């Protein structure tokens, strides 16, 4: 359990760093790409952590939804503003999952 917590902290810290860089970037295309990368890394992290819990199937489902959204956006070649919606969808999915798990991640707020 401690290892999972440490992994979560590490992921959250690296996401905070990339988020700070993303916020300071004014180019909308770069921000759009960063949001998609952030969604992908979050999905990957969830899949890695899911291996050690009984709610693994649910975590995998949320992660694969995020992956599919990013893949669809890359395929279609979406407008930069649409990735803001991706971020909100991903956060909603994560928060719903955490409520069911009884976990609150304060860092995402």
Swiss-Prot record:
GO cellular-component term (any): virion membrane
Q: Where in the cell is it found?
A: Virion membrane; Host nucleus
**One Pfam family named in its UniProt record:** Flu_M1_C
Which residue ranges are recorded for the region named RNP-binding?
A: 22-109
Tell me the subunit arrangement. Answer: Homodimer and homomultimer. Interacts with NEP. Binds ribonucleocapsid by both interacting with genomic RNA and NP protein. May interact with HA and NA. Cannot bind NP without genomic RNA.
Family assignment?
Belongs to the influenza viruses Matrix protein M1 family.
- What protein name does the entry list? Matrix protein 1
According to its UniProt entry, this protein's organism is: Influenza A virus (strain A/Camel/Mongolia/1982 H1N1)
């Amino acid at each position: 359990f401690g290892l999972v917590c440490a992994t979560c902290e590490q992921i959250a810290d690296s996401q905070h760093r990339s988020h700070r860089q993303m916020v300071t970037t004014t180019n909308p295309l770069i921000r759009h790409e960063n949001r998609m990368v952030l969604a992908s890394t979050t999905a990957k992290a969830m899949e890695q952590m899911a291996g050690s819990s009984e709610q693994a199937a649910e975590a995998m489902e949320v992660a694969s939804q995020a992956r599919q959204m990013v893949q669809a956006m890359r395929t279609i070649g979406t407008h930069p503003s649409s990735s803001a919606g991706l971020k909100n969808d991903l956060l909603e999915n994560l928060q719903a999952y955490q409520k069911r798990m009884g976990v609150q991640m304060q860092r995402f707020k």
